[in-house]
Curated annotation (Swiss-Prot):
InterPro entries per UniProt: Cupredoxin, Phytocyanin-like, Phytocyanin_dom
Lineage start: Eukaryota, Viridiplantae, Streptophyta, Embryophyta, Tracheophyta
Pfam families per the UniProt record, alphabetical: Cu_bind_like
Organism: Arabidopsis thaliana (Mouse-ear cress)
GO cellular component terms listed in the entry, alphabetical order: plasma membrane; side of membrane
Subcellular location: Cell membrane
Propeptide stretches in the record: 139-167
Signal peptide: 1-24
Protein known as: Early nodulin-like protein 16
Tree of life domain: Eukaryota
Positions annotated as glycosylated: 40, 71, 86, 99
Function, in words: May act as a carbohydrate transporter.
Lipidation positions, renumbered (GPI-anchor amidated asparagine): 138
Name of encoding gene: ENODL16
Domain Phytocyanin residue range list: 25-126
Amino acid sequence: MARVAVLVAGAVLAFLLAATNVTAKRWTVGDNKFWNPNINYTIWAQDKHFYLDDWLYFVYERNQYNVIEVNETNYISCNPNNPIANWSRGAGRDLVHLNVTRHYYLISGNGGGCYGGMKLAVLVEKPPPPPAAAPNKNSARRTFSVSGFAYQFLIPVAVFAAVGTRY
């Protein structure tokens, strides 16, 4: 029974230490206009912040366009040759996982789409740190953190449960 308590305490500790407040966002490229020609995707992206583990969701006419990743030079010249990645999966509903902090250069290499404006460049950044909690002037000076909780409660419980099994 005590071993179960140790396992439960360990599982709770692992869960609390792994929990984060950061969530990835799925961006529909072009919003309700989707991935189509004659849309300025530079303007669409200019007021957005793309963070690590966000997703770009491309919706387009599958028989006419595609989504490929190219280098900056090929992005500028709308050259689809030698792509870094082809994100098209054939259904016209493609996701690009922004899993590295860097520039991503995406174009449509089919149907002259890139020349019609179907090109998107985004810079992926690390997420900002969570905001610091404002101090409460009306209460005693107490702070709560996952690590403080772990050291003050979960670890003693786990130690007690482990020692309790020997006696």
